[in-house]
């Protein structure tokens, strides 16, 4: 089973950024949330799409930020951002996004 299949089966938005804060991957739910296709924004800095993103902070301090309540462009949501470490190398971040509508369902 491929990781993309697993990520797209999850009902929460998933965003993966590299160590430079550029978008590497997001699942279908996150794409619907931001109204973009991955192919159109891959390798662009997340701050171009989400200026208030906390990804740069997690990249800088290499510590997770959990359960941030955000409201951007009329979208209210919770986000948790975690550093990605592989073989003791810091590789970027993974963000989990839950919209208020998803909580109420």
Question: In which residue ranges do the predicted regions lie?
Answer:
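Sensory modules in modular signal-transduction proteins
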Residues: 1-33
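PAS-family sensory domains
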Residues: 24, 75-78, 91
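Terminal output helix/cap of sensory domains in signal transduction proteins
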Residues: 34, 38-39, 45-78
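Sensory coupling linkers of modular signal transduction proteins
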Residues: 83-105
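A residue-level detector for well-ordered beta-strand positions
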Residues: 15, 82-83
């Amino acid at each position: 089973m491929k990781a993309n299949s697993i990520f797209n089966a999850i009902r929460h938005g998933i965003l993966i950024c590299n160590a430079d804060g550029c978008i590497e991957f997001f699942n279908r739910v996150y794409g619907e949330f931001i109204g973009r296709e991955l192919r159109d924004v891959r390798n662009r800095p997340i701050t171009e799409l989400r200026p208030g993103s906390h990804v740069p902070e997690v990249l800088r301090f290499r510590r997770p930020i959990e359960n941030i309540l955000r409201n951007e462009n009329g979208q209210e949501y919770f986000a948790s951002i975690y550093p990605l470490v592989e073989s003791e190398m810091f590789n970027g971040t993974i963000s989990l996004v839950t919209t208020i509508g998803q909580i109420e369902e």
